[in-house]
Amino acid sequence: MSSLAPCFTVGSIVRCKTCFGDNISGEVVAFDLGVKMLIMKCPSSNGGGDEQTTCNVTIVNLSLCMDIEIVKEAIPPAEVQQPEPIDLPMIRERYRYATEHRTLSCRSYHPNASPFGQALFRLLVKRFGDPAIIWQNKGDQVAINILRQVVIDAPYATENIRYLDWNPKLAICVQEVVQNFCSKQF
């Protein structure tokens, strides 16, 4: 293959022979000259005849191709449709959600807490809100502190719940959450 790779148009049918002896042919889906990669939609090997509905998507490194042949050049449409406008509010919402989810995952990790305790921590954060739940160090063990009123010691079961300030509504709510979580885990 020459140092200047040919430019492929999307929709063209291309046949490539790799340095490993593989023959790959299919329709061009994407092409990047900078990294010399070609993404092709190849017919699936499970048959299907003329009504072929499944395809394999193959990524070809053009640096490893010995021979490239354009079997059929795609004819560009006379009128190109403009792409749909980007929905920025939706993208911002997805970004916010992903950031919150990763932050929660990072906050729920504690090296001295069991995976069970970390999962309970994440559930409590979803139930009571992010700033309401914190880890509380106790030597080699770590406890979950809820609203600075309730502490759940390891191994994080209903019998390990301690109340610093008695709040009957909070006590019942925390007990139900922990009980439901424990019953689903075992």
Swiss-Prot record:
CDD domains, sorted: LSm12_N
GO terms, molecular function: RNA binding
Transmembrane segments: none
Ranges of residues in domain AD: 84-186
Boundaries of every Sm domain copy: 1-74
UniProt cross-references to InterPro entries, sorted A to Z: AD, Lsm12-like, LSM12_ABD, LSM12_LSM, Sm
Family: Belongs to the LSM12 family.
Record's miscellaneous remark: When it was originally identified as the potential ortholog of GEMIN6 this protein was named 'Hezron' after the 6th generation descendent of Abraham. This protein is produced by a bicistronic gene which also produces the CG6709 protein from a non-overlapping reading frame.
PANTHER family: LSM12 HOMOLOG (PTHR13542)
Subunit structure and binding partners: Interacts with Sbat; along with Sbat and Vlet, may form an accessory subcomplex involved in SMN complex function.
Functional description taken from the UniProt entry: May have an accessory function in the survival motor neuron (SMN) complex.
Name of the molecule in the record: LSM12 homolog B
Gene giving rise to this polypeptide: Hez
